[in-house]
Amino acid sequence: MNLHGLELPGRDQRLSPEVIDLTEDIEDDGADVSEVTLLDLTRIPEFQPRRRIRTSRNHLDANLSNVPTINSIPSPVTRPPVAVGGGIFYGARRTRNRSQTQRRTLLENGFRNSRKKAQDSSNSIAERVSPPPGFCYDVHPHNNIACAKCGNELVSDEKKSIFAAKCGHLFCSTCAKELRKKTVPCPVQHCRKRITKKFIFPLYL
């Protein structure tokens, strides 16, 4: 592009640009020329990476000998056992000479005592709370099962049989025969469920 004779707006004089030849070497003693360090990436570096120093076994044993052990700690102050909920528990500090067998024995005794107390309390509650008469039977080896209607002892033999209703109550063969004739309510006071011919059946003991 020829810039000679070019007139720009706002300028009275014509532009006369200065041409600089970049291919010409400039010999200037005052110019600050710094040397550039070249790094050859194709060569293997002379220095080697640092390797981890292996610690010998003797050095480790010497360091471990300085660590305090349980035997080197003086015996702490003993604390009395604390009974909580029937079990015996010891405080955070315990004597070093107490064996594990003794501690296990004390814990077993505490659990045994707590179990015995729980059984005694449950037995006393069962004795105080008894079911209403005629509602259910507390069957024990020394108790005899009786008919829910006549109260006679129920015995299963060749002459008599035991019958049961759908509600769960037991009757002798004589009372069961009367109950099977017509639909009647259960004679037990707290039951009063309807007993029909289909809802009463014999028990083979």
Swiss-Prot record:
Q: Which UniProt keywords apply?
A: Metal-binding, Nucleus, Transferase, Ubl conjugation pathway, Zinc, Zinc-finger
> Has the keyword Cell inner membrane been applied to this entry?
no
One GO-annotated biological process of the protein: DNA repair
What's in the GO CC field? nucleus; SUMO-targeted ubiquitin ligase complex
EC no. given is 2.3.2.27
Its annotated compartments are: Nucleus
Which Pfam families does the annotation name?
zf-RING_5
The UniProt catalytic activity note for this protein reads: S-ubiquitinyl-[E2 ubiquitin-conjugating enzyme]-L-cysteine + [acceptor protein]-L-lysine = [E2 ubiquitin-conjugating enzyme]-L-cysteine + N(6)-ubiquitinyl-[acceptor protein]-L-lysine
ZnF locations on chain (RING-type): 147-190
Its pathway is: Protein modification; protein ubiquitination
Gene3D superfamilies under this entry? Zinc/RING finger domain, C3HC4 (zinc finger)
The record, for PROSITE patterns, names: ZF_RING_1, ZF_RING_2
**Which InterPro entries does this one have?**
RNF4, Znf_RING, Znf_RING/FYVE/PHD, Znf_RING_CS
- Molecular functions (GO terms): transferase activity; zinc ion binding
Physiological role: Mediates ubiquitination and subsequent desumoylation/degradation of sumoylated proteins and proteins containing SUMO-like domains. Involved in maintaining genome stability where it acts in the cellular response to DNA damage.
**Oligomeric form and interacting partners:** Part of an E3 ubiquitin complex including rfp1, rfp2 and slx8. Interacts with slx8.
| Protein name (Swiss-Prot/TrEMBL) | E3 ubiquitin-protein ligase complex slx8-rfp subunit rfp2
